[in-house]
Design a protein with these regions (language model features):
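The catalytic "switch" region of P-loop NTPases
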Residues: 112-223
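P-loop NTPase nucleotide-binding core
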Residues: 1-161
Length: 223
């Protein structure tokens, strides 16, 4: 019962780049999220709605409250806050949790526009911090510099939403090997190394990454 996603690395989608290639990789990964119930990608909104629905069901089942009761929304909001607060200690977790709370607020009040804004932010589609601050009250946007931290946050979140974890499949890693600039290759290799070290040191909980690469790219000592 995992959330899975994939990306095919290319000239336009890398770990690091000076033309938004890292953010493009992130956007593709979020766009390609899939679950058993939504196998054809685009599962992010389903995951969020399932999370909210599960918390609402807990309030119904264990507290005997029903939607429309004067304290029903209060109890669900408390559960939402408990989960989002638990993410604040992670890098960028405060803003991530705040956007999740905004999505729930939109669900609770019927404000579809607020939900769309939260989804836009989670998908890495905000271009300026000013716009994000105005729309969602957060001081951060997902960017080339921090996108991988948000993949780790998503891995934590999907477990809280009832899944076993997040699997990320990355194909065509040889694209990095083919970068003509030595500096560009090294930046991308260093990012790959940091991802590997996170896994080795237990800093990327509930996240599995599968990478495919050609034998030539693995064994060429010159690159």
């Amino acid at each position: 019962n995992f959330v899975v996603t994939d990306v095919e690395l290319s000239v336009d989608k890398r770990f690091v780049g000076n033309k938004g290639q890292g953010l493009a990789t992130y956007k593709e990964l979020i766009r390609n999220m899939a679950t058993h119930a939504c196998p054809d990608n685009g599962a992010l909104q389903l995951i969020l709605d399932k999370w909210i629905g599960a918390l609402e069901n807990e309030v119904v089942q264990y507290e005997g409250l029903v939607p429309g009761h004067e304290v029903f929304d209060v109890r669900v909001s408390q559960k939402i806050y408990k989960i989002t607060s638990s993410m604040e200690e992670r890098v960028n977790g405060f803003d991530f949790g705040k956007v999740l709370a905004s999505y729930y607020k939109g669900h609770r009040t019927g404000d579809m526009e607020l939900q769309k804004k939260a989804l836009r932010w989670l998908c890495g589609e905000y271009r300026t911090r000013t716009e994000a601050k105005t729309d969602l009250g957060v001081n951060l946007i997902i960017s080339d510099d921090n996108w991988y931290e948000f993949i780790k946050l998503f891995a934590d979140f999907v477990v809280k939403a009832g899944y076993a974890g997040l699997y990320v499949c990355m194909d065509e890693l040889a694209t990095l090997y083919e970068i003509p600039s030595r500096v560009g290759r090294e930046y991308n290799y260093n990012k790959l190394l940091s991802i590997y070290n996170d896994a080795l040191q237990g800093k990327a909980s509930h996240l599995g990454i599968i990478i495919s690469v050609t034998k030539e790219a693995m064994e060429d000592p010159a690159r």
